[in-house]
Swiss-Prot record:
A GO-annotated cellular component: cytoplasm
Entry function: Catalyzes the ATP-dependent phosphorylation of L-homoserine to L-homoserine phosphate.
Known catalytic reactions: L-homoserine + ATP = O-phospho-L-homoserine + ADP + H(+)
Key words of the record: Amino-acid biosynthesis, ATP-binding, Cytoplasm, Kinase, Nucleotide-binding, Threonine biosynthesis, Transferase
Organism: Corynebacterium kroppenstedtii (strain DSM 44385 / JCM 11950 / CIP 105744 / CCUG 35717)
Any GO BP: threonine biosynthetic process
Pathway(s) it belongs to: Amino-acid biosynthesis; L-threonine biosynthesis; L-threonine from L-aspartate: step 4/5
Main location (coarse class): cytoplasm
EC number, as in UniProt: 2.7.1.39
An MF annotation (GO) of this entry: homoserine kinase activity
Protein known as: Homoserine kinase
Residue stretches in coiled coil: none
Amino acid sequence: MPHDIPVGRSVTVRVPASSANLGPGFDTLGLAVGLYDIVTVEVTASGLTVDVQGEGAGEVPLDGTHLVVRAIREGLRVAHADVPGLAVSCENAIPQSRGLGSSAAAAAAGVCAANALADNALTTDQVIQVVSSFEGHPDNAAASVLGGAVVSWTDTPVDGETAPQYHAIGVDVHPDIRATAFIPDFTASTNAVRRVLPSDVSHVDARFNVSRTAVMTVALRTNPELLWEGTRDRLHQPYRADALSVSAEWVNRLRNRGYAAYLSGAGPTIMVLSTEDLPAEIVDTASSEGLRVITLPIAGPIQVNRKELG
């Protein structure tokens, strides 16, 4: 039987954005970056209120269908806890539908808030499982929860199982590595961009990506000089180029100049991993073409603070 959480208990969550795939690691590699949503959840006597400021304000629902609310409720269900009512406030800095893990961050914030309200009844692995279930893959979800870089994988259901099992492990990131995001002023639908991918790929291309994914884990941990080689990909970015022509053009322009650029998640954001700031002329050119350029540190794990009334 679910236990009741007292009215007045509140939680504030600071959740980082994330960049998925990192080139070759499709649905596998993820990286938390220093752009944050802040979500505050308070247990109330009844009802539901939702307030959204910043990114997504005026665009996302303010009822029980809001992703943060759905994630809170699922987290509470799994933790065998219940609340009479909720007040949810979101201060969003992560752009929506830009390939920076906004939906994974929302799900992570909701589940981690629920877990804190429920006295941390869930393990980290359970949290990642619940958050990933909203996404269908754990790369962004695990990065927002664990921080740093992650290697993730999914066990698909077999006979007798009803749901995929999601897993992730953290990877230490070399302290000199930082990320620069080139964020276009248009959005991309993850589902639409996934639909352009082929159902089968060649063994040659699969082997190419397996090797580059392995290289990327070394580049991230100990050898940033390998970042350009480690971000090469043949499994998804070439197929998405027509649907994301501006992004594909910028990836090529940056890579031709020796920068480790790749399509962040399903795009349209382009991410560059480097150990130095990019030249001002690149930033100025991108800005003149309508891209917002932000240099971001590698982020730590989600931060959760709980308060009691009085």
